[in-house]
């Protein structure tokens, strides 16, 4: 704590007025951790549209965070439908996420955020936070209608008028049958009658053939014993089949089977496809060979361990520096105990790659912050 205060005193914000509460250990450890905060403000979140199920959160107007270069930046705290956050450049850093408490205290997974006199509703098109867009400042006055038209969230009043298109849709009367539909119905009736006639004529022909007696059966049995090979049209071939002909037929069949196996796309995968899959196998792959071929595409990953702020800053810089090598970045996360919610160890960050070649190249050129170590691994599903 003393080191943080000395570093803050040497920065450009050391001349600002600070109170004992703002520089206390409890305030620094509160979310967002390891940051100095000013201007606390309470907001309400109502879960399941139940006025009795409301949680009160403390958000901050200004947040001071430390970078890897031991410099301090001052940013405004913001809030949207997903939680409270601040921006590190263009990167959103959420220190409160309402979705976590919605799973604990709610049943429907729906909530409303009440900031002063405004209510933040869920977006219609997407429920995932967009980086750098769709944010609402927590200390701003009631905004203008132009600023409220946001891409990922929308701040609106509680009274809403239903769209007119819905009323027209449900009050629309069914259209009367036209001449086109009448013709189609007649054609369908004629087709059904033709099908019934054909089935009756076919059944009669089968009955007449069955009455033919034993002579036809004997004649057919003789023809079958003489020429067992039949063509496509049901006609017999010339003369009996010899032993040499049967061998040639078996050879041709084996060749056709081998050709069909060789032309199958499941025969193997090219080196370029290794590491291209980012999903685990489904139930359709029952054979062991198919599973091995699919599992060869499992993407490799690197697990980073270190301080949360260092990992976030590294991720922000790595997206620009290693954008051709790293395929996906995860958010920072931590392990918790099996019997408690206390965090265990340092924060984690996962980096996913398309192939082992890209991961090896990344390892050769990567520069990790001090105090951050790494390990290799593979995942069946990203």
From Swiss-Prot:
Annotated stretches, region: Disordered: 124-282
Keywords: Activator, DNA replication, DNA-binding, Early protein, Host nucleus, Phosphoprotein, Repressor, Transcription, Transcription regulation
Quaternary data: Binds DNA as homodimer. Interacts with protein E1; this interaction greatly increases E1 DNA-binding activity. Interacts with protein L1; this interaction enhances E2-dependent replication and transcription activation. Interacts with protein L2; this interaction inhibits E2 transcriptional activity but not DNA replication function E2. Interacts with protein E7; this interaction inhibits E7 oncogenic activity. Interacts with host TAF1; this interaction modulates E2-dependent transcriptional regulation. Interacts with host BRD4; this interaction mediates E2 transcriptional activation function.
GO biological process: DNA replication; DNA-templated transcription; regulation of DNA replication; viral DNA genome replication
Alphabetized Pfam families for the sequence: PPV_E2_C (PF00511), PPV_E2_N (PF00508)
Post-translational modification: Phosphorylated.
Listed Basic and acidic residues bias regions: 163-175
UniProt xrefs under Gene3D superfamilies: 3.30.70.330, Papillomavirus E2 early protein domain
Bias kind Low complexity: ranges: 261-270
Biased composition (Basic residues): 250-260
Protein localization: Host nucleus
Record-given protein name: Regulatory protein E2
UniProt feature coiled coil, ranges: none
Protein origin, superkingdom: Viruses
Biased composition (Polar residues): 146-156
Keyword Cytoplasm tagged: no
Originating gene: E2
Reported function: Plays a role in the initiation of viral DNA replication. A dimer of E2 interacts with a dimer of E1 in order to improve specificity of E1 DNA binding activity. Once the complex recognizes and binds DNA at specific sites, the E2 dimer is removed from DNA. E2 also regulates viral transcription through binding to the E2RE response element (5'-ACCNNNNNNGGT-3') present in multiple copies in the regulatory regions of the viral genome. Activates or represses transcription depending on E2RE's position with regards to proximal promoter elements including the TATA-box.
Stretch list, region Transactivation domain: 1-127
Segments for region (DNA-binding domain): 298-382
């Amino acid at each position: 704590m003393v080191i943080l205060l000395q570093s803050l005193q040497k920065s450009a914000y050391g001349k600002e007025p600070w109170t004992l509460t703002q520089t206390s250990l409890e305030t620094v450890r509160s979310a967002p951790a390891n940051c100095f905060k000013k201007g606390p403000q309470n907001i309400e979140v109502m879960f399941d549209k139940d006025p009795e199920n409301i949680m009160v959160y403390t958000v901050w107007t200004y947040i001071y965070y430390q970078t890897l270069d031991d410099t301090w930046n001052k940013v405004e705290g913001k809030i949207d439908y997903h939680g409270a956050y601040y921006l590190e450049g263009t990167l959103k850093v959420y220190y409160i996420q309402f979705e976590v408490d919605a799973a604990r205290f709610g049943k429907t997974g729906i909530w409303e955020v009440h900031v002063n006199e405004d209510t933040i509703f869920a977006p219609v098109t997407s429920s995932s936070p967009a980086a750098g867009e769709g944010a609402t400042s927590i200390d701003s006055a009631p905004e203008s209608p132009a600023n409220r038209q946001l891409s990922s969230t929308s701040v609106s009043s509680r009274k809403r008028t239903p769209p007119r298109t819905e009323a027209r849709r449900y009050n629309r009367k069914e259209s009367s049958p036209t001449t086109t539909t009448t013709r189609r119905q007649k054609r369908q009736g004629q087709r059904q009658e033709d099908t019934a006639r054909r089935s009756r004529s076919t059944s009669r022909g089968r009955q007449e053939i069955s009455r033919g007696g034993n002579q036809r059966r004997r004649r057919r049995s003789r023809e079958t014993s003489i020429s067992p090979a039949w063509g496509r049209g049901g006609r017999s071939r010339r003369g009996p089949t010899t032993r040499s002909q049967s061998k040639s037929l078996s050879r041709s069949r084996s060749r056709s089977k081998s050709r069909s196996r060789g032309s199958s796309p499941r025969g193997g995968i090219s080196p370029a496809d290794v590491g291209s899959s980012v999903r685990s196998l489904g139930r359709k792959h029952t054979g062991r060979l198919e599973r091995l071929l699919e599992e060869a595409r499992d993407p490799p990953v690197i697990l980073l361990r270190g301080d949360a702020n260092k990992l976030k800053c590294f991720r922000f810089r790595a997206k620009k520096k290693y954008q051709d090598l790293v395929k996906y970045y995860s958010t920072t996360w931590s392990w918790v105990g099996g019997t408690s919610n206390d965090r265990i160890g340092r924060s984690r960050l996962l980096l996913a790659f398309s192939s082992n070649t890209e991961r090896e190249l990344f390892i050769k050129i990567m520069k990790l912050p001090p105090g951050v170590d790494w390990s290799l691994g593979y995942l069946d599903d990203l």
